[in-house]
């Protein structure tokens, strides 16, 4: 089983790769915060209560803007989407994780990105583009030209994979996927590794990048103890099997 410190090295290797290839425009190093028997894998400027602070207002422009304003992410990709990793180890055993891919709610072009100096300036760019888009939408609606507008606002949901066996109930799977709203908890086979998450993001949302880089396609998967229950297997759920362990 991979340790918290091994995960830190893996995440920082990923961040270095994304920066070197121009796929990320801002980043925060992965670090570990130790507290008693707990080790929390987080980022350098993350809130102290990582697993509580990021709950609420899920899948809203307000939440996204708060995250980019406070740089609450491990990295921001070239299109303004952000990636967060969070793992909690208790007595060297994985007890929680929260991995989130948060797409930018606006279409951000490469020329937009070239107009700013650093990721710190992205909030100003986002506010400007959002204001322009709202003004354009307002004018289009009043002039009955809405259907002709080149809409930059996107109906894109974040994807957040949570693992929290301490909160497991019949309606709260130990491992689950949030999308669209906080109350949607789609059962997942078990805790997901960095490899599962990286492959999920780039394979499904950046297919050209996925096809170009062997590093992403070959990123290893680690499997922890499955947490899916018989009841959850009777519903639609997210599955993945470790075929390498089969005879």
Q: How would you label these PLM feature ranges?
A:
Residues 75, 83-85, 158-163, 176, ...:
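Generic structural hydrophobic/aromatic packing signal, biased to beta-strands
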Residues 1-78, 82-83:
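N-terminal "first-domain core" detector
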Residues 184-247:
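Long, compositionally biased interface segments
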Residues 41-44, 49, 85-95, 105:
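Amphipathic alpha-helical interface segments
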Residues 70, 80, 94-96, 156, ...:
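Short, well-structured alpha-helical interface segments that form or flank functional binding sites
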Residues 37, 72-74, 97, 120, ...:
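Histidine (H) residue identity feature
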Residues 70-73, 81-89, 144-149:
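Short secondary-structure capping micro-motifs at structural edges
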Residues 90-192:
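An exposed acidic His-Trp-rich patch
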